[in-house]
Amino acid sequence: MSCRSEHIWIQPITGSRKTSNLCWAIILFLGSLGFLLVGTSSYLGRNLISLFPSQQILFFPQGIVMSFYGIAGLFISSYLWCTISWNVGGGYDRFDRKEGMVCLFRWGFPGKNRRIFLRFLIKDIQSVRIEVKEGIYARRVLYMDIRGQGAIPLTRTDENVTPREIEQKAAELAYFLRVPIEVF
């Protein structure tokens, strides 16, 4: 859902707050919590989970391994929850023809460079470029070629877009910025 007028185009960017990331974080948390509870049950010799008796799983070696997997899964799950709450990769692209500026903003990890803010003059934009790699893992990425800066990606590399969608995005952006389109 982008906001567009005659002179300004603001395009929001979805970061790590995607449904798939949320589903993986929930599944990983519940699975690793289950592993940790089973490992702890085998250590204590009591049923913390009533699905099966704790006597069926020996603490050494199965209980230790399950506890280790549970702890490792909780660490990975907490990493996912942190990236979701910080919205890493989220932000916006603002194209302003009136001021002649392009502003790209992204949220990063907490610290010194939490806010990533790039500014360019529209006159420095050489072209809008589409890079297509076909095959089993097809990839279509939209870039903006900046004079002296190189190519800056505007779409996520893991975003699975159809050729028609990427062409339409590139055509709209090139028309708005009044620059040519290149395909690689």
Swiss-Prot record:
It comes from the Eukaryota. The chain crosses the membrane at residues 22-42, 57-77. Keywords: Chloroplast, Membrane, Photosynthesis, Plastid, Thylakoid, Transmembrane, Transmembrane helix. It is a multi-pass membrane protein. Seems to be required for the assembly of the photosystem I complex. This is Photosystem I assembly protein Ycf4. One of its GO terms (cellular component) is photosystem I. Signal peptide: none annotated. One of its GO terms (biological process) is photosynthesis. InterPro entries: PSI_Ycf4_assembly (IPR003359).
